[in-house]
Each structure stands twice: as C-alpha cells, then as structure tokens.
Amino acid sequence: MIVQFCRKAGIPYDVYTFTNGWDNTTSDVYDLVEANDVSLHGVQCTHVLTSQCNRRVAEQDMCNLFHQAWKLSYSYSGANYSHQLSMGGTPLNNMLFGVPAMIHDFKVNNNVQKVSFVCLTDGESAPLKYYTKHNDKVYNEMVQWGKTFLRDGSRVYSLNTTLMTQSIVKYLTDKMPTVSITNIYLTGPKGSVQYAKENLQTSHYDISDFKKNGSDTITTTDGWPLICLVNPRTFKSGTEDIEVEAGAGKSKVRAALKKFLKGKSSSKLLLASLVDQFS
C-alpha cells in the first residue's frame, strides 16, 4: 500500500527484504573483515521493488512478491518463489548498519535530499553479531551482556545490550539527522503492549486506542523516533488500488488514500505518520 501511494504521488522508493533463512556467504568475504567488525554473515538483503523501472516491470515485481508470500503462507501452492526470500530469523540489528549506505545510494540514484526510512517488522531482532579472529580463522560471536561500544570514524557510541535495537536506531538518527525514521510493527493486542512498554521504558501502556482503531503510534527519544503499532488484521479487506490519476497533486493523493483506507481502522495512523513525512 505504501508503494501504491509513492507511485501515485511520484515519490521514488526502494523496498528491501532481509532474513537469515539461508546463507550464501563466500569464503572470500572473510578476507575483507577485521576483528570486531559488525558481522553480516548469513544476512540476506534482497532488493524486491524499485521506482526505477517502468510500470509493467513494477507490476510484475509486485506480482512476484505476492507469489512469494502466497507460497510461504500455503506450502501446497504451485506459485513460483525464490529461496532467497524464504522465512528465517530476524537479523534486524545487523541489517540496520547497512541502512546509511542504502540511503546514500538512494539519494544519488534518485537525486533527492529528503528521505524517509520505514522499517516494517513483526518480531524482535536476533542478537547483534560481530566478527572475531583466532589462528587466522574468522568466527561470528553474538553480543550478549556487558558494555558494547560502536566506533564509527572518530565517534564512539555506547550500545545498550538489553535495548540493542533502540541503541542502534539512536546511532542512526545521530548519523543521519535529516532522515525520518519510522518502525511499523505488526502485532496483536498482547504484542503491542509488550513492544510499547519495552520501547517507552514504562510499566504501563494504554491499549484502548489500539483495540479501538487496530493501530496506535508512539514516539521515543532513545530509539525509534516514531513507532506505528498495527494489527495485521486491518489489511484483510479493502480495494486493491488507490484510485487517483498518476501525477495528481498532494491534496488529491491524500484524499484518495483516505478513501482507500475508508473503513480500515489504521487510516488515521497511516495518514498521520507516513503522508506527513513524505510531504
């Protein structure tokens, strides 16, 4: 749906998936790493959608992505799929370190200055991994407990091992102050309470808005600047496309998106958190 909005509004976009469901790391990669480097071993990042293609190719890409999801949901389906998009763990913490390079390339390729980074997840990240070397062999270790420091050039950041994802996002907001960062977290009522408490560092979270609307937003100062908690059941029905002419003005796109989401409890959330960022 976000891609549809970007296409109608003429906003460039790139969509990536990431998993550690399979590993194609070649041995020559280890010749380039140093001890204590953040590890990308086994992390598979796949570029699945982009605005830098014509309409026919873009729609075929979305169709292929749908086939992938259908196959993963219904294993008996005869739909074609790619094992590179197979489900696995969630190496979010490690993958976040690749975001600055992605955004740099995105700015160059699309000649843009303002960028919004939206990370959609449905679970917590696996522990952060880093490389170690022993007897000229490279190993992967997981950060578990104790103090962890991240060095980026001349800057050193302290990472909280109990709130690792939040610490990494805080590092990203400092490194990329002009980039809007949002986390869309798909979860049910119970998961929304747990996730909100963890990110707000509080013992209480009022779930009434989430239950009423199927979504809620929270803001933090020491992690994700904006978190959109969304119940995936919200997207069970609705029209399949945003009805607006290509190249329409922002007001028409906003109205069309509102109509598209009419009857969906997440409409207020998405309009407030995403459209305002893109405008």
What are these regions (language model features)?
Residues 1-279:
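Acidic, glycine-rich A-domain
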